[in-house]
Regions:
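Crotonase-fold acyl-CoA enzyme core
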Residues: 101-217, 240, 244-249, 253-256, ...
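Terminal peptide-recognition signature
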Residues: 23, 27, 42, 60, ...
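Hydrophobic alpha-helical membrane-association signature
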Residues: 38-42, 92-95, 198, 239
C-alpha cells in the first residue's frame, strides 16, 4: 500500500471520502467476524492515514445487522485440534494487539458505529475508538469467560479504564452483556441512538471532527493516552510540549484570527 492509496479485501471495504477515511466491515454472513487478512488491511489503512494529510478523521461501520462478532475462530483454527504451545503468544502481538494499539495511537480521531452485536475484538475496536455511537439495543459482550478462555486485544486494559473495574468485572469475568443504552449511561460508548439513526449520527460526528483542528485534536488524543501511565510532572511537561507544537499550526493561527474577528474558524487540518 502506497502512502496515499487504500486497499480493500474480502470482508473489509476501505475508501477515502474527502477528508474522511471510511472502513466498512463487510462480512455479514459471519457477523462481520474479523480474520487475519481483514485485520492486516485495517492496520495498513490506519498506518497510511497517519501519513496522509488528506485524512482528518476515520469512520468505522459495518454492513448487515451486526458490527463485529469477534475473531473468526473456526476459520482460523480449521484442521487444528489445539493451538501449539506459544502460538497464541506469538501471533496476538502481530494481529489483534497491533490493531487495537493502532486505533489508540493513530493521530486522527476515529468514530465507530455499532449496531447489533459487538463481541470480543469487535467490542474492543469500538471501545478503542475515540467516539462510538451504539444502537440502543446493541449487544456489547465479552464471550471469553463462557468459552474457558481469557480476553484478548486489550479488553482487560480498555474496559476497566472506561467503565471502572467493578462494571468491567461483570463483563470480563461473569460474561454479562450490556445494551448500547446501558453502555452509554456508564461511559463505555459516547452515545446511543435508535438503530436506524446510528450510522448517520456517527457520520455526522466524524465529519464534524474532520472539519476540526486536526493537529491539536491528534495531540489531545496523545495526551489523554499517555496521561494514563505518566506522572503528573511528566504529564505537565507533555502538555507544554503539545501546546508548543499546536501553536505552530495554521489552524491555531486561524483560530486566533477567527476569535478576534468574531466568526467561526475554518480549519484546514494543518
Amino acid at each position: 500500500m502506497s502512502e496515499h492509496s487504500y486497499a480493500s479485501v474480502d470482508g473489509l471495504v476501505v475508501e477515502l471520502d474527502g477528508a474522511l477515511l471510511r472502513a466498512r466491515l463487510d462480512r455479514p454472513s459471519k457477523r462481520n467476524a474479523l480474520d487475519d487478512v481483514m485485520v492486516a488491511c485495517l492496520i495498513d489503512a490506519l498506518d497510511a492515514a497517519n501519513r496522509d494529510e488528506r485524512v482528518r478523521a476515520v469512520l468505522i461501520t459495518a454492513n448487515g445487522d451486526h458490527f463485529c462478532g469477534g475473531f473468526d475462530i473456526i476459520s482460523r483454527n480449521a484442521g487444528a485440534e489445539r493451538p501449539r504451545v506459544g502460538s497464541i503468544q506469538r501471533r496476538l502481538p502481530s494481529q489483534a494487539h497491533r490493531l487495537i494499539a493502532k486505533v489508540l495511537t493513530v493521530q486522527v480521531p476515529i468514530v465507530s458505529a455499532v449496531r447489533g452485536t459487538a463481541a470480543g475484538i469487535g467490542l474492543h475496536l469500538a471501545a478503542a475508538s475515540d467516539f462510538c455511537v451504539a444502537a440502543n439495543d446493541a449487544r456489547l459482550w465479552e464471550p471469553f469467560s463462557t468459552r474457558g478462555f481469557t480476553p484478548d486485544s486489550a479488553g482487560t486494559w480498555l474496559l476497566p479504564r472506561l467503565m471502572g473495574p467493578v462494571a468491567a468485572r461483570r463483563m470480563l469475568v461473569l460474561g454479562a452483556a450490556l445494551t448500547g443504552s446501558e453502555a452509554a449511561a456508564i461511559g463505555l460508548v459516547h452515545a446511543a441512538a435508535d438503530a436506524a439513526a446510528v450510522d448517520a449520527e456517527a457520520e455526522a460526528l466524524a465529519r464534524q471532527l474532520a472539519a476540526g483542528p486536526t493537529v491539536s485534536l491528534g495531540l489531545t488524543k496523545w495526551l489523554m493516552l499517555v496521561g494514563q501511565t505518566t506522572t503528573l510532572d511528566d504529564h505537565l511537561q507533555n502538555e507544554a510540549l503539545a501546546m508548543e507544537l499546536s501553536s505552530r499550526s495554521e489552524d491555531f493561527r486561524e483560530g486566533l484570527k477567527a476569535f478576534t474577528e468574531r466568526r467561526s474558524p475554518e480549519f484546514r487540518g494543518r
